């Protein structure tokens, strides 16, 4: 007589979403709510908080906050000091000096802290639909391949950081990086004439993937179908009212 055996269900890979937060608590909270509303109820969210004025203090279920508001995890002053010839004409804005470089350093640290991989989601986006298909472990990345970044004099492309799955085990196995001290955004000697000073967020990642083909492959998705993006400069102190107006305009995506 044959005994009935219960088939074990295949365990789904962990769904991890990471947000780098910088002074936008209202937007970050709405971004998480939009994730929950569009199929991400059980996704775990990690917030890496680099704020110097408006930290993320909201307690939310399934959300872990890594507090770097005083440089506890990444000391940006010490990191920037490693680049004494950095050029403030690239990658600097009032209230956010070398923000892109700091963002890249943060995502590289997240590769260490979340070694199974994750979807990087910016704090100033609201989702329109589920992002389940981004979690494709057969790919090294899933996201939008911007072949040439606008206003980049060297036409360097990048994987847009607004919404991008990164298969960290696959990427690290082939030596890919998110931050590379030799390919940065404004940190190197030579200023605007140095091509290696024009690697914005996601540029090093894309270049390393292309250099490792076919060992590393990625999937291009038009993320415009998945999100509304507030736009650049959402972290600036003088746009609080614009945050409110934008969230009100798109309240159907997060409320």
Describe the residue ranges of each PLM region.
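Short beta-strand/loop segment that forms part of the nucleotide-sugar
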Residues: 42-53, 67-71
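Catalytic core and acceptor-binding pocket of nucleotide-sugar-dependent glycosyltransferases
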Residues: 172-246
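N-proximal low-complexity "stem/linker" segments adjacent to membrane-targeting elements
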Residues: 2-33
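Short, charged/polar "capping" segments at the starts of alpha-helices
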Residues: 26-28, 52-58
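Short, acidic, metal-binding catalytic loop of nucleotide-sugar glycosyltransferases
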Residues: 34-42
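Short beta-strand-to-loop acidic/aromatic patch adjacent to the donor-nucleotide binding site
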Residues: 116-126
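Conserved catalytic core of nucleotide-sugar-dependent glycosyltransferases
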Residues: 127-203
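Active-site-proximal specificity loops/subdomain of glycosyltransferases
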Residues: 55-113
